[in-house]
């Protein structure tokens, strides 16, 4: 137990030092959603009307609606960015040292996932603070109730990133694979438009967005900010996170997963 906690603390410290040592990474993580908030949302405010739907009890501006979605964007991009370090560690050889430590492989990957999730939550709160200064505020208690939901959402997208990293052979391929995943997940969700708006445009588009686990992560965050639990969205988020983590563990299993295939298969082949 002591060694397991030491590994968790060490990996969290390593992730924190790497993150705070790259100030450009923090700035980039915040600039992206802020541009959406200040430019995109302001431009579409008059064109996109929003009806009163839960968790909202009155009409809201488009900026207010997309803030939870932009929080989800931060979690999504940082989860994928965090998995990039696994690809780098594999190329540098430090991944082998990590995975051969006298601890269960699932625990080491979970520690990596927890460390990345904590960094994502810090970025999300930094964005919420800027949004509050801009005038978009939520109930005071909502900033507390959203914390565990942010962790669960960050866990889900982080697990997806780790699962994908097990399939990437070279660092050069990372950007293409991540963009192939990030943009469909983000745009085919309720991050920017409510599902009922999607249904008005296309029933098929609505069904795709409703099946997207990122949609449920965003909705869980949205409801938590208004101190209203959305148990269905939370359940889907947790279930998707467990499935993605299971795929990640299989991918990093040297006997069965993608790591073995990259190494050239069994010794006798």
Language model features with spans:
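Aromatic- and glycine-rich beta-strand/loop motifs that create alpha-glucan
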Residues: 1-32, 261-268
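Alpha-helical transmembrane segments and their short interhelical loops
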Residues: 105-179, 228-251
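Junction motif at the cytosolic side of a transmembrane helix
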Residues: 47, 225, 235-269
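Membrane-interfacial helix-loop-helix junctions in multi-pass membrane proteins
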Residues: 18, 55-56, 137, 190-243
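Short, membrane-interfacial amphipathic segments enriched in basic
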Residues: 1-13, 157, 201-215
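Transmembrane helix segments
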Residues: 42, 46-48, 165-211, 215
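Short helix-capping/hinge motifs at transmembrane helix termini and TM-loop junctions
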Residues: 40-49, 77, 131-139, 166-170, ...
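Hydrophobic alpha-helical transmembrane segments of multi-pass membrane transport proteins
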Residues: 35-40, 60-134, 180, 185-186
